[in-house]
Amino acid sequence: MTKKQENETSKELGMDNKKTSGKSGKLKISVSAIRKGEKKTEGKRSNARRRANNHSNDHSKRRRPAAQDLLKDLKQKQRADEARLDQESKAAKQEYKKSLNKAEASESKPVVKKVESVEKPAETAAEAPKVRGPKILKPSPARLKQNQANSEKPAAKPSSSRRPSSRPSFTEAPMPENKEGRRRKSGKPGRKGQNSYADQGRGANSNRSEQRKRKNKKHQSAPQVKKQVTQRKDRPLPESFEYEVGMNAQDLGKILHREPAEIVKKLFMLGIMINQNRSLDKDTIELLAADYGIEAVEKVHEDISDIDNIFAQEMEESKNSENQVVRPPVVTIMGHVDHGKTTLLDRLRHTRVSEHEAGGITQNIGAYQVRINDRLITFLDTPGHAAFSSMRARGAEITDIVVLIVAADDGVMPQTIEAIDHAKSAGVPIIVAINKMDRPGANPAHVTEQLMQYELIPENYGGSTIFVNISAKTGMGIDELLENIILEADMLELKADPKQKAIGTVVEARLSRGKGPVADVLIQQGTLRVGDPIVVGDTFGRVRTMTNDKGHQVKKATPSMPVEITGLNDVPESADKLVVFADEKTARAVGEARAQQSLQKQRENVQHVTLDNLFDTMKRESMKSVDIVLKADVQGSAEALAQSFQKIDVEGVRVNIIHSGVGAINESDVTLASASNALIIGFNVRPTATAKSQAAQEGVDIRLYSIIYKAIDDVKAAMQGMLEPTYEEKVIGNLTVRETWKVSKIGTIAGAFVDNGYVTRESGIRVIRDGVVKYDGKVASLRRFKDDVKEVKAGFDCGLTIENFNDIKEGDELEAYEMQEVKPG
């Protein structure tokens, strides 16, 4: 055999001549090297057989004896190498098993030791196989000696301060192979070993799992009390429980150890539909307790629904508070109608409110704050007409000082006497202002003599009442009046605690189309803030917005400050008390309870027919009645009209107020009036377009008024059968304001489009904003382009001005009307 053939044969058998020639030492074998060597050898064998077969098939005819001998020698060498490799593999496996058994006997944790190298006889370059595998780190002799000594020692208990590592070394010793040639792990056949990265990770996870098992076993063996957590539904029901009116399903679920959904379901089975957040009354809670078979006891506490009692307690606590500060005085201007109350207030505020009021009289309470010489004064302007007696009474109750206006040329009148009585019953001081001193017929001495009959004696006559002669029109005596107001306030030592919860009184209330229920409130103690949960009379809510008397939104309102608030669930009554509660839940419960009490009182006031009152009932039913559906712009006006109608005394006829409310006249009002054959009276409000057409179809009479005594006179005349009008108001056109211009010496010019009908220069005109009449007057001028015209018909633009009114805005509706004669018959 030539040298070249020998080299080729050596390469085919996987032998490296450079590594094996001249060496007669020990051959280090690892499991991975053996396995790779076997695979490579097997591959070499198959390749050699394939080449041999191909060679024999292709060149069988040309085969020479030398080639046959060479092939025979190669096969013999292959068989010899296979036998030798099998013996070496078996020896390595046996050695590894011995080391494993020895490590398990010496220590509790498996320690993988390095398998000693297997001696291999020296081979020639042609005989040594080529084995490739991972490089095996050879430990130092000192390390081997230490490992051997540790394996012979008995296993020591791990110290409590430092636990031994449970991770085995993955590179110190090869893993053995099973009969199928696959590596096994921890004695489990068919699993991969720990030489690859994946095997090392799985080994680490296995060790961590063993650590967790040992830790759990240790905790289980230790005497430890395990915390038991029981669910709410598994806990037994109490024998009895204490409840409060207003609790919801969630609150009851916590007490009864039941889920809120179960409470809702049980009440549903009992015929009561609720949700988890709805407040429950006493009967519902007791019914639920009876169904569970337990006793329910109502918690005894102070009646928080008694707003008047809470209001009185808060007022008393504020007097003894250490946080009291000086507050502005609340001054109410009272007197007879048309004696100059609003004119005086206009002089103080530098405004012209009285010019915009229908008939020149005030018909609701207005609250304003005026700063005079760095001092704030809150003024309340009350109506002077006889119909507004309740408004004057409310003004006297919430005021500190009453300024009584008496006209010098008119003297004491009925409403003047009524104002004196209201002030005396409220126990507030009175300052008399004798107005209209600029008129020729002014006689202040006569007025003084008249007032002395009602125990109002001036200081110069030895009394204690302050008298001031003024002229609201010219400004005479105004400074002296203000000085006396401030002096009287200082003597009263008016103080309040701004840190306590706010309390106040409703001055006026109404329903706004864009804002909803609106209440004008005077804060008397504490500070009201946006977001506070409040109860106002029978209504409740959370303060959404607050607006001061100048129309600016504010975040808080201090004592003696009038504000307009929104956020209530309904329109409150005038003179209702406002109280702030800790949370909205309590406020809701109190408001609902008060509404229920009010409804119960209304039911109790219904007079049922009995044998005792049968005759009176028959007599009353035989009387003729004027049924009225009453709608007004504010709550106070509706209340005043209803009281005035009830006071009309006509024999054989009575007034029956079917419904009273605030806001524009709508379809529901027309339907109610049609069903009951009633008359609709609107005070400073207008019907909607749908309501107007429905009323025309159903023949419902709608009467609109802006002055209260005209409404009272018409109702009285109708009751007496004397209402035979010779003139009737007829709407002749409707306009929409598209633009406005302000021109000096002229005022505000409205550019309007005539939607239907027509408008003339002599027609009356009403300004309607959001369904409420803002002004009723006459057309001052009417133009098309630059020409004055007498009439503008539908479909054309025009420019017009209104007498004594400049507060015209884009989007306002204008209603043109004429008074036409009605022919009898």
Swiss-Prot record:
Establish whether keyword NAD is in the entry.
no
UniProt-listed Gene3D superfamilies? P-loop containing nucleotide triphosphate hydrolases, Translation factors, Translation initiation factor IF- 2, domain 3
Which intervals carry biased composition (Basic residues)?
A: 181-191, 211-220
| UniProt cross-references to InterPro entries, sorted A to Z | EF-G-like_DII, IF2_II, IF2_N, P-loop_NTPase, Small_GTP-bd, T_Tr_GTP-bd_dom, TF_IF2_bacterial-like, TIF_IF2
Chief subcellular location equals: cytoplasm
- Swiss-Prot/TrEMBL keywords: Cytoplasm, GTP-binding, Initiation factor, Nucleotide-binding, Protein biosynthesis
Q: Where is the composition biased (Low complexity)?
A: 158-169
Q: Which GO terms describe its cellular component?
A: cytosol
Query: Where is region (Disordered) located?
Result: 1-239
Tell me which PROSITE patterns the record gives: G_TR_2, IF2
In residue numbers, the region (G1) covers 335-342
Q: Which PANTHER family match?
A: TR-TYPE G DOMAIN-CONTAINING PROTEIN, TRANSLATION INITIATION FACTOR IF-2-RELATED
Q: What is the name of this protein?
A: Translation initiation factor IF-2
The record lists the organism as: Lactobacillus delbrueckii subsp. bulgaricus (strain ATCC BAA-365 / Lb-18)
